[in-house]
């Protein structure tokens, strides 16, 4: 099998969520954070030819980048991974899947309580401003008939009362109130346009960011509130 640049970019993103991954035959890949706060899945254009566990995905991708774009990836007779182009061959150790954390099955996200969207340029601004202003927490909330993302530094503002950044997403004509709080450490998502789905039921809250190719389900912080 061969991995395209698009697939490699997705795998690099997944490696930021979990350094290990279990690849299964087909065109669907998924991962989750070791602490369970983030789940990600993608439909890729390439076909995974064999099941294999990788303990250090980043290092595997680094080695892959050192051979030609035409390199063929296959399962060697000893159970390890063979990466070969016309002149060179690299053998990469496969992992025992018991040594990595991976999702057993795709997450079925519940029917959303609120659906909105965030454009690629707005997401890029949010991530850049967050780094520049040391924003470690964001809250997706409704205010004055709008759905808004507010950014905070929770270390200096534990009550999340003084936003350092605010971004209006869209109008909101619902009757429910919500304040979905996300740790920015869990916002490891690829650039792009996303449908944002918010769900709450009692003390359970989650958000799903869905693009045409990649989706992420992110757990909310305990101080999230809603009246759904």
UniProtKB/Swiss-Prot annotation:
Keywords, comma-separated and alphabetical: DNA replication, Viral DNA replication, Viral transcription
Chain's gene name: 45
Oligomer status and interactors: Homotrimer. Interacts with the viral DNA polymerase; this interaction constitutes the polymerase holoenzyme. Interacts with the sliding-clamp-loader; this interaction allows the sliding-clamp-loader to open the sliding clamp. Interacts with the viral DNA ligase. Part of the replicase complex that includes the DNA polymerase, the polymerase clamp, the clamp loader complex, the single-stranded DNA binding protein, the primase, the helicase and the helicase assembly factor. Interacts with the viral RNA polymerase (RNAP).
Protein name according to UniProt: Sliding clamp
HAMAP family: Sliding_clamp_T4
GO molecular function, a single term: DNA polymerase processivity factor activity
Reported function: Sliding clamp that encircles the genomic DNA and links the DNA polymerase to the template to control the processivity of DNA synthesis. Responsible for tethering the catalytic subunit of DNA polymerase to DNA during high-speed replication. Interaction with the sliding-clamp-loader opens the sliding clamp so that it can be loaded around the DNA template. During transcription, encircles the DNA and tethers host RNA polymerase (RNAP) to it.
Gene Ontology terms describing biological process: DNA replication; viral DNA genome replication; viral transcription
Taxonomic superkingdom: Viruses
Source organism of this protein record: Escherichia phage RB69
InterPro entries: DNA_clamp_sf (IPR046938), DNA_pol_proc_fac (IPR004190), Sliding_clamp_C (IPR015200), Sliding_clamp_T4 (IPR046389)
Pfam families assigned to the protein according to its UniProt record, in alphabetical order: DNA_PPF (PF02916), gp45-slide_C (PF09116)
């Amino acid at each position: 099998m061969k991995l395209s640049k698009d697939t490699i970019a997705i795998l690099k993103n997944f490696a930021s969520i979990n350094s290990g991954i279990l690849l299964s035959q087909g065109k669907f890949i998924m991962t989750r954070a070791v602490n369970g706060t983030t789940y990600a899945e993608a439909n890729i254009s390439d076909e995974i030819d064999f099941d294999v566990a990788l303990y250090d995905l980043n290092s595997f991708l680094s080695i892959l980048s050192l051979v030609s774009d035409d390199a063929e990836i296959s399962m060697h007779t000893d159970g390890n991974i063979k990466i070969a182009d016309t002149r060179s061959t690299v053998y990469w150790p496969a992992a025992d899947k018991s040594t990595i954390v991976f999702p057993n099955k795709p997450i079925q996200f519940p029917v959303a309580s609120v659906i909105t969207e965030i454009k690629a340029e707005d997401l890029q601004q949010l991530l850049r401003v967050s780094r520049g202003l040391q924003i470690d927490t964001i809250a997706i909330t409704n205010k004055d008939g709008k759905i808004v993302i507010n950014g905070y530094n929770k270390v200096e503002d534990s009550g999340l009362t003084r936003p350092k950044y605010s971004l209006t997403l869209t109008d909101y004509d619902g009757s429910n109130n919500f304040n979905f709080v996300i740790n920015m450490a869990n916002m490891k998502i690829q650039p792009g346009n996303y449908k944002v789905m918010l769900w709450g039921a009692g003390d359970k809250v989650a958000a799903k960011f869905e693009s045409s190719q990649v989706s992420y389900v992110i757990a909310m912080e305990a101080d999230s509130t809603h009246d759904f």
